[in-house]
Amino acid sequence: MSIRPIAGPSRRLILPCTRSHSTAHSRPTPSHAYAVSPLSSRPGPPPPPPPRTEATSSRPDLTPEQHDLIARIVRVDQAGELGANWIYRGQKWGSALRGDRKTVKEVEGMWASERHHLAVMKLVQQQHRVRPTLLYPLWQAMAFGLGAGTALMGREAAMACTEAVETVIGEHYDDQLRALKPLLESTASTAVSPTNPNANTVADAVAAPHPSLPLLASVLEEFRDDELEHLDIAVEGGAQKAPGHSLLSAVIGFGCKAAIKVCERV
């Protein structure tokens, strides 16, 4: 158990979390419930994916306001994982063009976990019947350009890009977890589960919210921790030594925050 501060002078405290390296999941993780095997850099195959369950194949009965919250969370996270995939694709291309094998290898590891995230978020989006963002082509082009451009500037600039992006994403996942907490509590205290044949009273039936909601929160925590590991890698890789680090980080961070706001609705 650790408390991870986001790197930088004005960034908030990340919630307590248990960390395991995103590219070395040898045990089932929350996202494993969606039948997408976790990544493993160790010898041998990963654990077989479990069958789909109520938590991964159905959605809760929510008010319009509650569904809007879930829709905004899922839409922006799916778009964010798409953007991350294209940033790392661009970074790999730019680093390879410079002959920087070390950075290529590090980027490949982070990109692998982002592909896993995107595969899971696509299933979450389908489960909760959330319309994906309409701006996919734009995000793809902009994200690839950002990744490739910073990689062509040098290793430190590429790592500064990763640091800035993952800082914003880490904070954003925390914001989403805070927003989900009242929903988990309210659905647990008001909903009578028709799937519980042993519930004779309301008190018997309201022990927990629809299983998809705590699972979603656990998946967000897992992905947040993965993104913070990418942040660690970037800082250790010399992100803060990049020329114009403060300006570069500020511009990229502002762009990420603007993209989040747009994707929540569009």
Sequence positions of predicted segments:
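Non-heme di-metal
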Residues: S2-V266
